[in-house]
């Protein structure tokens, strides 16, 4: 799946079945369901899930928790605008 198809899929009621849990987290975030997004990020394992988890906590304003998850993901704390970070993470996860 490419980024354009991912964005188009957000119009559906449920995420495409082939998406990883980390991508499902970002899909639910785009739908405005932070709680469901967080559930997916918590269930995801590895750096991809940690990266989605970091973004979600940064978005909710919990900078200390976000910093913890950025560290687990091996990433610096993002200072990008949230929409730009969301897109960058989605694009990175789609090619990984």
Identify the residue ranges that each predicted region occupies.
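TPR/TPR-like alpha-solenoid helical repeat scaffolds
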Residues: 12, 54-63, 79-96
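Repeat-mediated protein-protein interaction surfaces in helical alpha-solenoids
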Residues: 1-13, 26-39, 91-92
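Generic helix N-cap/helix-start motif at coil->alpha-helix transitions
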Residues: 15-21, 45-50
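TPR/TPR-like (Sel1-like) alpha-helical repeat modules
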Residues: 45-47, 59-80
């Amino acid at each position: 799946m490419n980024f354009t198809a991912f964005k188009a899929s957000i119009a559906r009621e449920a995420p495409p079945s082939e998406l990883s849990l980390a991508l499902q987290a970002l899909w639910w975030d785009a739908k405005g369901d932070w709680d469901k997004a967080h559930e997916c990020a918590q269930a995801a394992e590895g750096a991809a899930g940690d990266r989605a988890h970091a973004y979600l906590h940064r978005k909710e304003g919990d900078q200390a928790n976000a910093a913890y998850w950025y560290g687990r993901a091996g990433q610096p704390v993002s200072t990008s605008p949230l929409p730009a970070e969301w897109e960058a993470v989605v694009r990175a996860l789609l090619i990984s």
